[in-house]
Amino acid sequence: MKRKAIYPGTFDPFTNGHLDVLDRALNIFDEVEVVIGENSQKKTLFTVNERLEMIREIVIEFPGVTVAVLHDGLLANYARQVEARAIVRGVRQVKDFEYEFQMSLLNRHLYPEVTTVFLMPNVKYTYVASSIIREVAMLGGDVSKFVHPCVLAMLHKKLQENKKSNS
């Protein structure tokens, strides 16, 4: 039986920190499904389809990686549906862990067969968050060291589109 995990997140945008956690997960699991959460309460820069395209382009050469969208519903139910035995979460700081720990307990209650695996990214990514990447890029800063080249191109294109629509 293959060891399958899901790696959920908003991924707006997908950063090198996310990629690092995914790479670490692939050292543990045979299959990892990156699951893009679609949350109507969260204002995102990229649409869910743009994030799907972005991540698919990045992981195309990673055997054992698939990408999907969770439009609605509980993550624990989705994990059960795809027969994943683990939920991978990247944890950069204690603050991240407190929230993720609560969620892991809830997911375990809803789907007792699932385990949450907390992975710390490489230290060079501990301060990299999608929200920071968006803000730095919007203010004209260089984020090329923190995102894949395809993400950088999509960021520049999206920011140009937003600039045109706001003028």
From Swiss-Prot:
GO CC entries: cytoplasm
Biological source species: Chlorobium phaeobacteroides (strain DSM 266 / SMG 266 / 2430)
Origin organism lineage: Bacteria, Pseudomonadati, Chlorobiota, Chlorobiia, Chlorobiales
Listed name of the protein: Phosphopantetheine adenylyltransferase
Assembly and interaction partners: Homohexamer.
Superkingdom: Bacteria
Residues reported in the UniProt entry to bind substrate: 10, 42, 75, 89
Alphabetized UniProt keyword annotations: ATP-binding, Coenzyme A biosynthesis, Cytoplasm, Magnesium, Nucleotide-binding, Nucleotidyltransferase, Transferase
Protein family (similarity comment): Belongs to the bacterial CoaD family.
Cited function: Reversibly transfers an adenylyl group from ATP to 4'-phosphopantetheine, yielding dephospho-CoA (dPCoA) and pyrophosphate.
CDD domains (UniProt xref): PPAT
Biological process per Gene Ontology, one example term: coenzyme A biosynthetic process
A Pfam family annotated for this UniProt entry: CTP_transf_like
Site (Transition state stabilizer): 18
Record has ATP-binding as a keyword: yes
Record localization: Cytoplasm
Keyword Cytoplasm: yes
Catalysed reaction equations from the record: (R)-4'-phosphopantetheine + ATP + H(+) = 3'-dephospho-CoA + diphosphate
Pathway(s) per entry: Cofactor biosynthesis; coenzyme A biosynthesis; CoA from (R)-pantothenate: step 4/5
GO molecular function: ATP binding; pantetheine-phosphate adenylyltransferase activity
